[in-house]
């Protein structure tokens, strides 16, 4: 029979010291905490944590080793109207656990009770935590530390990126091992991206509703254990080290790794959801609750983590440090990041945001906010503090509207092209703060954006009610991928115009994986539950010419000084000149009155020509000898100081020097 010693209150979670394992769990309102350990026959032994330091319950188990499976039972009042939902009949996961054994299944036995305790024991069907050892040989690994103004982000899903790649060994496709395979590294470096932003790799659970439909949470935003590397994306049985191998391989190629992390809600969902972890450990501390103990739902996922509580702030900060120090990641993208600044109203001076900003162990990390949630005052674009960058939906929507609908002025276009200075040039923020994107995992792919006017999400099992209807897409005359050659050519021209705009805008460009390959999701703009060939990239059918075009754009971006400077463009600094199609400065009327033709002179030498009109037009070029710059088509060179721009066309010219 194992016996617990007193142990210590830090660090939280299960910590192996070479001789045994220390366990520490936060709970302010609990009256009794039991550590539950399980042998290979699933036999449970309960050990009471009698030592308590403040609100931390702790104990030390001598001779315990990595691989030990465990959980907790936490007892205390069950008073839902007071926010108290303790239930010792439910085996609970350690919120700081580094590994999960098993999977959270759809079973009513996991329900802790709505108005009264559910007394069915959940241990037999509940997944278990696993003690891990974190030693690893990083060799000479170094963070690439790519400067923000030199960063090009590539957003991808581990499985979606690698599952169908024919040159990756079949037994590792769709995994972290595939991500670090030389074939994938070579592809990313040849494309020219500098940072790989991964959809969640934190251990997640599939919602009961999806399990009932035979679907999975493909994206992974239903996070269960934020400290644990998701087992479902590992080729082998050691997800942590497999992930670290991939990070090390990417770093050797100079590619940063940014993780999409979820701290706004948990996998316990609403009051009818399962009791898996925080709800049973300390419901009042971990969640935002109403006056009668009801869950606030500013996330749309049933609950909201209370990120202004000191203990919850410490938990998040410990988690970020784990991924930074143990896994060597280079940055984080925070899902529904307004929640991080709620007190409950949003403030840029919120304690968690301040902790991230000032933590010495996170210095050099790239921090990216998705600056909204669905609560009151949830839209906070431009309001996050330095050093955060932010996903810009204004950039996405305005650029889509300019090219695909023609209802955005040149003034609005120019503001987005210039890193949305009207939004971000405040509070000492720099142009990199605008994460410019046309598409992302949620929404249409670029090919679908020019092929569908309406979403087609029936496969999600929600009657096509899910996903946004505000897409600003344009199918160019026919709904769906199949169309005549004229429509297909116009769609390709629109894709190239949008991609050129994205890559050559000031700010930080983010490219959705597959957009450079012509990937389609058949019009599904909310493919969160499609873990299949709908979302996986089809490498063998890829548009290689489009990929080469995008790689050329990224290379071109690197050669233009105006796009490599850290500071804002200023009038007269030589970085940018805005010209009409006659080659003259735009008049106030032209800025705001329906013009769709524009010349942008960058660094005095690169001339970006935009004809977003539905009609061809002549552009009078500034003085000098101009030639078409790669990767643009040299079959339409300027003649006699004039460029003949086709409808919905874009081109970059370079001024020849003597």
Swiss-Prot record:
Keywords of this entry: Carbohydrate metabolism, Glycogen metabolism, Glycosidase, Hydrolase
Annotated site (Transition state stabilizer): 442
EC number of this enzyme: 3.2.1.196
GO molecular function: glycogen debranching enzyme activity; hydrolase activity, hydrolyzing O-glycosyl compounds
Residues at the catalytic site: 335, 370
Gene Ontology biological process: glycogen catabolic process
Keyword Lipoprotein: no
InterPro entries from the UniProt entry: GlgX_C, GlgX_Isoamylase_N_E_set, Glyco_hydro_13_cat_dom, Glyco_hydro_13_N, Glyco_hydro_b, Glycogen_debranch_bac, Glycogen_debranch_GlgX, Glycoside_hydrolase_SF
Root EC class: hydrolase
Extent of Basic and acidic residues compositional bias: 457-468
One family name in Pfam for this protein: GlgX_C
UniProt KW Hydrolase keyword: yes
Pathway where it operates: Glycan degradation; glycogen degradation
NCBIfam families (UniProt xref): glgX_debranch (TIGR02100), PRK03705.1 (NF002983)
HAMAP family associated with the record: GlgX (MF_01248)
Function in brief: Removes maltotriose and maltotetraose chains that are attached by 1,6-alpha-linkage to the limit dextrin main chain, generating a debranched limit dextrin.
Family as reported in the entry's similarity comment: Belongs to the glycosyl hydrolase 13 family.
Protein name from the UniProt record: Glycogen debranching enzyme
Native organism taxonomy: Bacteria, Pseudomonadati, Pseudomonadota, Gammaproteobacteria, Enterobacterales
Gene coding for it: glgX
């Amino acid at each position: 029979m194992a016996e617990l010693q007193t142990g210590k209150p830090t660090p939280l979670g299960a910590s192996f010291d070479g001789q045994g394992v220390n366990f520490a769990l936060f709970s302010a309102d609990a009256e009794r905490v039991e550590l539950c350990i399980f042998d290979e026959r699933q036999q449970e032994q309960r050990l009471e944590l009698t030592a308590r330091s403040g609100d931390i319950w702790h104990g030390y188990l001598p001779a315990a080793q990595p691989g030990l499976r465990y959980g907790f039972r936490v007892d205390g009042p069950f008073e839902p109207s007071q926010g108290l939902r303790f239930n010792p009949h439910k085996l609970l996961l350690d919120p700081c656990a580094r590994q999960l054994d098993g999977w959270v299944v759809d079973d009513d036995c996991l329900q802790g009770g709505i108005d009264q305790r559910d007394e069915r024991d959940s241990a037999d069907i509940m997944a278990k935590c696993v003690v891990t050892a974190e030693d690893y040989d990083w060799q000479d690994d170094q963070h690439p530390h790519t400067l923000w103004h030199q960063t090009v982000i590539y957003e991808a899903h581990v499985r979606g990126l690698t599952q169908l790649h024919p040159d990756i060994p079949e037994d590792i496709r769709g995994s972290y091992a595939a991500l670090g395979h030389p074939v994938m590294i070579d592809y990313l470096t040849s494309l020219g991206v500098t940072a790989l932003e991964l959809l969640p790799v934190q251990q997640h659970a599939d919602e009961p509703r999806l399990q009932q439909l035979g679907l999975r949470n493909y994206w992974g935003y239903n996070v269960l254990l934020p400290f644990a590397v998701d087992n479902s994306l590992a080729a082998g049985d050691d997800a942590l080290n497999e992930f670290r191998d991939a990070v090390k391989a990417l770093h050797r190629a100079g590619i940063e790794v940014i993780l999409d992390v979820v701290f706004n809600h948990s996998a316990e969902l609403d009051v009818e959801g399962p009791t898996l972890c925080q709800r049973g450990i300390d419901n009042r501390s971990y969640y935002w609750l109403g006056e009668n103990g009801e869950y606030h739902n500013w996330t749309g996922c049933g609950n909201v983590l209370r990120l202004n509580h000191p203990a919850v702030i410490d938990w998040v900060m410990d988690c970020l440090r784990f991924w930074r120090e143990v896994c060597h990641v280079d940055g984080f993208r925070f899902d529904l990041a307004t929640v991080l600044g709620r007190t409950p109203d949003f403030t840029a001076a919120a304690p968690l945001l301040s902790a991230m900003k000032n933590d010495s162990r996170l210095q050099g990390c790239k921090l990216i906010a998705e600056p909204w949630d669905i609560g009151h005052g949830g839209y906070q674009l431009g309001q996050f503090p330095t050093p955060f960058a932010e996903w810009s939906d204004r950039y996405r929507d305005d650029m889509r509207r300019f090219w695909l609908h023609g209802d955005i002025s040149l003034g609005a276009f120019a503001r987005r092209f210039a890193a949305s200075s009207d939004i971000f040039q405040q509070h000492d923020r720099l142009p990199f703060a605008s994460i410019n994107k046309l598409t992302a995992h949620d929404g249409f792919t670029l090919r679908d954006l020019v092929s569908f006017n309406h979403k087609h999400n029936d496969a999600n099992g929600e009657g096509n009610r899910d996903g946004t209807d505000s897409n600003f897409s344009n199918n160019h005359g026919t709904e769906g991928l199949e169309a005549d050659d004229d429509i297909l050519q116009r769609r390709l021209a629109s894709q190239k115009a949008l991609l050129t705009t994205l890559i050559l805008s000031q700010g930080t460009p983010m490219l959705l994986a597959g957009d450079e390959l012509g990937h389609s999701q058949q019009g599904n703009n909310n493919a969160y539950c499609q873990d299949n060939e709908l979302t996986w990239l089809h490498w063998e059918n890829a548009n290689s010419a489009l990929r080469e075009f995008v790689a050329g754009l990224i290379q071109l971006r690197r050669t233009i000084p105006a796009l490599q400077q850290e500071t804002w463009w200023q009038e007269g600094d030589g970085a940018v000149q805005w010209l009409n199609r006659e080659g003259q400065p735009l008049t106030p009327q032209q800025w705001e009155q329906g013009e769709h033709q524009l010349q942008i002179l960058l660094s005095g030498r690169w001339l970006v020509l935009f004809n977003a009109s539905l009609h061809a037009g002549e552009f009078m070029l500034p003085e000098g000898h101009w030639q078409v710059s790669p990767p643009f088509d040299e079959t339409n060179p300027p003649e006699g100081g004039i460029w003949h721009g086709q409808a919905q066309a874009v081109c970059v010219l370079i001024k020849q020097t003597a």
